[in-house]
Amino acid sequence: MKIAIGCDHIVTDEKMAVSDFLKSKGYEVIDCGTYDHTRTHYPIFGKRVGEAVANGLADLGVCICGTGVGITNAVNKVPGIRSALVRDMTTALYAKEELNANVIGFGGKITGELLMCDIIEAFIKAEYKETEENKKLIAKIAHLESHNANQEDPDFFTEFLEKWDRGEYHD
């Protein structure tokens, strides 16, 4: 399995630790940068990770910046990417199993290296639990990637809100 990984200059050391961990587990790592501590901009590296995954060069991706917010937002702008900012195992597993996330993001100054490694390994091993409902939700999310008139409809998500109101979803 190939894992694309990218970061900004703030968390290069953390990225390298995660990369070393993944290699020790037998995964092929595609290092999308950055490679040192020279000031740079996280969107560049989020985009690179996203493109590697979306183009099939990598199976999954990992993005890390200081808080994780910026790089996760950046990678989510790449069509075909479903990324989640995670800080715990439960969130990572939900993202993969229910939403078929293909990239996870971390705040390298918030989440410790060992915890990141544990979460990433669980994320990689988790499997998407395909259901008709999950497929429909993912299709709705993917539909947002391109502009279309339906997105302007204030009732775009009404079907899912009605199911929530009927108690078909739970926290």
From Swiss-Prot:
Gene3D superfamilies: Sugar-phosphate isomerase, RpiB/LacA/LacB (3.40.1400.10)
InterPro entries reported for this sequence: LacB (IPR004784), RpiB_LacA_LacB (IPR003500), RpiB_LacA_LacB_sf (IPR036569)
Biological-process GO terms, alphabetical: D-allose catabolic process; galactose catabolic process; lactose catabolic process via tagatose-6-phosphate; pentose-phosphate shunt, non-oxidative branch
Superkingdom field: Bacteria
GO MF annotation list: galactose-6-phosphate isomerase activity; ribose-5-phosphate isomerase activity
EC number: 5.3.1.26
Subunit structure, interactors included: Heteromultimeric protein consisting of LacA and LacB.
NCBIfam families the UniProt entry points to: lacB (TIGR01119), PRK05571.1 (NF004051), PRK08622.1 (NF006381), PRK12615.1 (NF009258), rpiB_lacA_lacB (TIGR00689)
Family: Belongs to the LacAB/RpiB family.
The name this protein goes by in its record: Galactose-6-phosphate isomerase subunit LacB
Gene: lacB
